[in-house]
Design a protein with these regions (language model features):
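Phosphate-binding glycine-rich loops and adjacent basic patches that engage nucleotide phosphates
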Residues: 1-6, 26-36, 68
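C-terminal capping/extension segments of zinc metalloprotease domains
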Residues: 1-14, 19-25, 74-153
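Short pre-active-site segment immediately N-terminal to the catalytic Zn-binding motif
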Residues: 19-35, 52-57
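Extracytoplasmic/secreted proteins, especially bacterial periplasmic and envelope-associated proteins
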Residues: 32, 36-40, 60-71, 101, ...
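Catalytic Zn2+-binding segment of zinc metalloproteases
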Residues: 40-57, 71-77
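Active-site metal-coordination segments of metallo-dependent hydrolases
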Residues: 51-68, 91-96
Length: 153
């Protein structure tokens, strides 16, 4: 979990985790833990990035961090199966998408990053956010279908 005490500051951020939650999600290897920390670190990097969507884009930021987790896994040839399987059964809420959507974005990031490299697109944070958003728009009807369980729009 990423805690930001002051939205405008990078100097007061805290990165922490819940061991029981990690155990419940089957995060039982250094590689899986590293991917979870990639997701949490992504929240820090994106803390001042505005995403479109209900609840100030809370789901979209979660999915973007999941995508970045997948990107890292693709670049370093890391296994995402434990993290993805641990997330698949997690319920959604107003702040977090259901696990099936999250696993989808992790897997997409892992395999899509190779295409991005082959196209010669520099792997900058902004370019990867753009690539994430292209995919988000492709499957927006599926995302909104899930969001309707938690939001009225």
């Amino acid at each position: 979990m990423f805690v930001n005490w002051d939205r405008g500051s990078y100097y007061d951020d805290v990165l922490c985790f819940n061991m029981q939650q990690l155990i419940d999600m089957k995060v039982d290897s250094k590689e899986a833990f590293s991917l979870v920390m990639t997701h949490e670190t992504c929240h820090r990097v994106l803390q001042n990035t505005q995403f479109y969507g209900p609840n100030n884009g809370a789901w979209e930021q979660e999915l973007c961090c999941d995508y970045f987790m997948g990107v890292r896994a693709g670049l370093w040839n890391m296994d995402v199966s434990k993290v993805a399987m641990g997330l698949i059964t997690t319920p959604g809420s107003q702040t977090h998408p259901e696990g099936t959507l999250r696993a989808l974005f992790i897997r997409y990031g892992k395999y899509h990053v190779k295409e991005v490299q082959q196209q010669g697109i520099p792997l900058t944070i902004q370019n990867l956010i753009t690539e994430f958003d292209k995919y988000r728009l492709q499957i927006l009807p599926d995302i909104q279908k899930e969001q309707r369980k938690y939001f009225r729009f």
